[in-house]
Structure formats: structure tokens, C-alpha cells
Amino acid sequence: MAAEATPGAAFGPRRRLALVIGINDYENYSKLTNPKNDAEKLSSLLQNIGFIVDTSSLVKTYAEVMRKVLDFQLSIEPNDVVLFYFAGHGIQWEGQNYLMPKDFPKFPEINEADLKEIDGISEKDIVKKKIADILIKDISKKKISDILKMKAVNAQDILNTLSDRKPYVTIFLLDCCREYILRNPDLNRRGVNSNTSNFKSTGLAAMHKAGALIAFACAPGTFVDDRPKDKNSLFMKHLLEHITTPNEDIVNILRDVTNGVMKDSNDEQIPFLSVQLRHNNIYLCGQGRGKKNDFE
């Protein structure tokens, strides 16, 4: 539920708004341990430093996430400071990053109507079978694209819609670089090579937007593991440690987070920052030492 704004809750004259989403209990993909804890802890700390935070625990399905994003977008006024955080499953497909809601469906099976183009091809004919495999894979790729567009949330679209409201800055944090494979059991039953019938996630793609600060938990094209023995992800562990640091620019905070993650992972996990800020000296907690705080 959204936190109520109170007099003096926001530091300085600019409002601070945050939408924080963490999804653990996926219906059709591996359940995760950290996202819900990460979202709850981050929300609490953001509220403590003056953010108006929306972190409803009911936001899980595609319809709920899309409605919440729309409501959040419409709440943004020019010159607000905006923070968006998502933890859960995410996937890159054809250069776009998609955030997966709780009810993201299984890989769709190919039915007989989809295979009508290859009727009559003999499985004994090696050349024709290769043609059949190619056609099946093309059909599968189209189905993946269609279902992602209809049932997953395009991260770049969220970033664009938030930025279109003309906020002072958009801070966009994604902790969803987990590896998995979109499997098509129907193709495997037909004997199609698993390297062609299953589509492996390749991590997230870099994102850009003027006026935004974008941070991924790991570098584009790489992955992180869920940490079932720990309450928080490695990225969140260090974000929680640094985000309330007074008198520190947000870019420096995220660099400290990056250094901490790299140290703890022996450089196996490298967070990625994309900085296209229009303003300098953005402090989330306190004013810069002897500097003009552009946040105010």
C-alpha cells in the first residue's frame, strides 16, 4: 500500500516517489527467495529517507503490475524524483528486456495447425527433416515474441513512460538477471535438437534514456543466482548498506554498491550502470558537503 505523504516527509521541495516490486512465487518458473525480502527492506529504508513508496504485496500478476505501473506513472509530476525497482525473473528477447510477472505462462506448445506447412515431410529424409526443424524453430520464436509482448512487461516501455512525465530524475533499478531456459517439450518429443528447440536466456540488454540513472544487478548478457541461504540478493545487500548514506551523490552510492558486489563475488558479478543524468549532485539523504544540492 502506498505510504501517506506527510509534511516534511520529502527532503527538500521535490517530491520523491518510488514503485518497488519483488516477485518470489512464480507459477510456471522457479520460485525465488530474495525478491520479496529485497522489496520490503528497500521500501522501508526509502520511506525513512522521505520517499513516498508504493510496494503493495498484491502486485504480482501481469494485470496487477501493469495497473500499478500506470497508476504510478499518472502520479508523477514534473520535477519529481522517481525511483523504480523490480526484482524477480527477467529476460532479454530480440534486444528488449522483459520483466516476468507471477503468472507468466509456460512456453507455448506447437499444435498441428502450426505444423501444416511441413505436412508430408519424411522424418527419414535428413534434408527435409532439417527444413522441418528450421520451420518449427521459426514458429517457436514467433510464439515467444507474441507471448512476451502480451504477458510480460517491457522494461524500456516502463522507463519511457516514467520519463515522459518529465521528472527531475528517474532512478531505474533491475535485479532480475537470472538464467533459465524457455523449454518447448513438444519440440523435444518430436526429436528436434534441444539446442534449437529450447531458447536460453542471455541476460538483460543495456538500456538508455535521457535523464535517467539505470542500474542492473549484473552486466548485460550475464547472470546472477538467487541466494536461498541469504535474506537478500548480493546487489540488494550492498544497496541497503549504502543508499541511506548522507551527503553522498546517488551515482557514487551505486559505484560503492558495484565495488561491494564485485568484491564479495570475486568479480564474478559486476553490476552495470548507465548514467544519462541531466543534473549533478543528486543526494537522496542529506545535502552535499559544501556543495549546492541540485536535488532540492
PLM region spans:
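Cysteine endopeptidase catalytic domains of the caspase/legumain-like
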Residues: M1-E296
